[in-house]
Amino acid sequence: MSLSRREFLQALAAAAAAGLPLASRPQDETFYDLPPFGNVSLLHFTDCHAQLLPMSFREPNANLGVGAGANRPPHLVGEALLRHYGFKPDSREAHAFSHIDFGRAARKYGKMGGFAHLATLVKKLRAERGASLLLDGGDTWQGSATSLWTRGQDMIDAQKLLGVEIMTGHWDFTYGAARVKEVLAKDFAGSIEFLAQNVETTDFGDPVFKPYTVRSLGGVPVAVIGQAFPYTPIAHPRRFVPDWKFGIEEGRLQRIADEVRGGNGRKAGAQVVVLLSHNGMDVDLKLASRVTGIDVILGGHTHDGVPVPVVVANAKGRTLVTNAGSHGKVLAVLDLDVKGGRIVDYRYRLLPIFANLLPADREMARLIEAKRAPYAEKLAEKVAVTEAFLYRRGNFSSTMDQLILDALMEMKGAEIAFSPGFRWGTTLLPGEAITYEQVMSQTAITYPQVVVTEMAGETIRANLEDICDNLFNPDPYYQQGGDMVRIGGMSYSCAPGARRGARIGDMRIGERPVEPRKTYKVASWAPVAEDFRDAGEPVWDLLARYLREKKIVRPRKLNVPRLIGVKGNRGLA
């Protein structure tokens, strides 16, 4: 099914008649008017983290770039981002792509995302265009209670109904190799192609997944190459993919790009070459400068909502590099005009998904309701109410992470607590209930154990240095992690631009310096090391118990490091 503009406006009017909130500005009626252009269209979303329902998600106020990445996309936040892209303050775009005045703007513009609303937009755009592909950049099966409890099945069924045609992955691998193979052999067979050129077996180096596909769109051969997250066995427990090897595989990618361009003698080579990537945007920018023959990189992993493609020059041409945000908040639309065997022009829009501007697709809404029904009572349990603004996003800390850290320290009697620098997890506004579903939206992983250890001060510092280098190494190919680990109970300083091993300093508990040889009781969760595989209770149990005892969550002071050498950096607001 697809929606014409007339049908779309009729659905919008029906929603208003039913009492659903609609913003009153006249331009809202035309917010999703996107005139068709060219003869090939690519629709792309990524990193939805299993968010089937509309939600709130605050963008970061700290997304520092270092080296060549400083003060350029994607490392722009707040007012610097608005100025760079020409967004008006207090506009829908300002709310979608920045953290500015988030609470007030969220109440004004309502929730974002939701697969039923995304489905409506996808149908509208595909009806208006001729040949198109819908691509999913991965991190789709993880991030919610229902996705964890169904081992991703709720999202897999939603992907199929949405019409996804091609996918790559990252967090999706944390259900284990056997589950991934099962989905590809059964659920995806004949409908969705899972592509990854950079995954091979550890024994003989055989490809695990199909590396690329070539589709004919309106007579134009379009090649799509898959690029899974290259550091999956480092960022997550190795046991999930024990027989698979991951990497950037730049050389192999170049060979594939040359191959699909050249054809095989029986048919013409691809006129458009696309990399569906889960590298992260900084990695993609470097890759685009070194690998030739790729027209477009549709990127993910770093959750960067980049409204305008970055054009990267290389030895034989140029590559458009994009990154399409996260949590189902946006849908990227790339229209290409292909003539004479090459792209001669393009149009790109990163469309925010405002739930109050897009009527819910009935078929998708029914599917979501059916998937949630067996768990509805458990999901709806109100464990507490927040008076604080609870969010997770940013290089160093966030209020939701601070809440988890406080819970770890209090419930485990620890001096120090660590919480992973995950980028996923929905946002709660002051006055909203914290349901069990919200607890799970911050913690739903397949290795949730809480760990309590004795750790020497020098070990703590060494660990922080390693994590910091994963984030701030000036060579993007060495940026292997998420954001900086969140820390409770201990203050420290951080110099992102310093050399490896010299970024962390002035570690203190209260006024007392952390001593190198002294041991400290440290609580954490999400252990990657095999030693802690069955170490303790799931973190969601601990957090829910803590919240039930507190009943009300009040604003708390963020434990943000003292930053050195970042004055004037437009990735910090």
Task: Please annotate each region the language model reported.
Residues A80-A96, F229-P230, A373-A384, T435-V439, ...:
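Short, compositionally biased low-complexity segments
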